[in-house]
């Protein structure tokens, strides 16, 4: 009977080995069942080892709402083991997209792309590398009130950053309303900056507001924290006019993947906070000139996706 079970159209003779599985398991069985990979034209990214056919990719296709396209998901992730070629594949696709007319913004926290102007001379004139150091000339460039154009967006980002740094939850009925009120007052004023939030909290004069102000001010003692805080007098901003823009932040100290949020050091908190600001700014960049295909490339995205504000 057990042998007969393997014959097509045969009945089941033994019920001891039945496995109840989910739809995910069944879907996993179908992986590799087809040889259809990529598009019929586009960027050449490799070939199939089984068939020898070239594989082409058109990253802009999903964003155009083309009739008959299989997916309209705009996000893509590169996952794999260390040294598996994730960064190389990512860089290659971004590079070719720029050659095809796209505009790209890469958030490069590990500063691995600092020599692209020298190594890619054919497009050097269209590469803009923004290296944010702790020098005085860069003071306040990552302040939410400086980097975001819309005051409401600045206010929302300021809340995310300050609640992230201080650990104040929106469910905290005592501290959160006080912090929210101070940020709203700064948003409605003429001079906007995170240092002004500290001044508003001190002007409140209560024990809770003073405690929050002291907590926020304690972060400003670090040199590269000056990127996040301004007095509202910063007039310059980060320019993204070139085809390929790379934002690097020097001295970032990113936590290990295994480190829980509660175990983050002060430097790690500030580093992730800066990545949250830059990433929010990068996503805002997508909404400019919708006629141009744009790419926002978030390297080391896991570091800020581990916390609620980063997500």
How would you name each of these model-derived features?
Residues 1-75:
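Basic- and hydrophobic-enriched, low-structure N-terminal and domain-boundary segments
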Residues 61-84, 89-95, 107, 111, ...:
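Conserved P-loop NTPase motor cores
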Residues 80-143:
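Walker A/P-loop NTP-binding active-site region of P-loop NTPases
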Residues 81-84, 92-100, 116-119, 123, ...:
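Generic, well-ordered alpha-helical scaffold segments in large soluble proteins
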Residues 133-236, 241:
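Helical/strand "switch-coupling" subdomains that flank nucleotide/phosphate-binding cores, especially
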Residues 169, 252-254, 303-305:
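Short acidic, S/G/P-rich loop/turn micro-motifs used as interaction or catalytic elements
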Residues 235, 250-252:
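Conformational switch/transducer regions in large eukaryotic molecular machines and scaffolds
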Residues 245-247, 296:
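Hydrophobic positions in the central parallel beta-sheet of the AAA+
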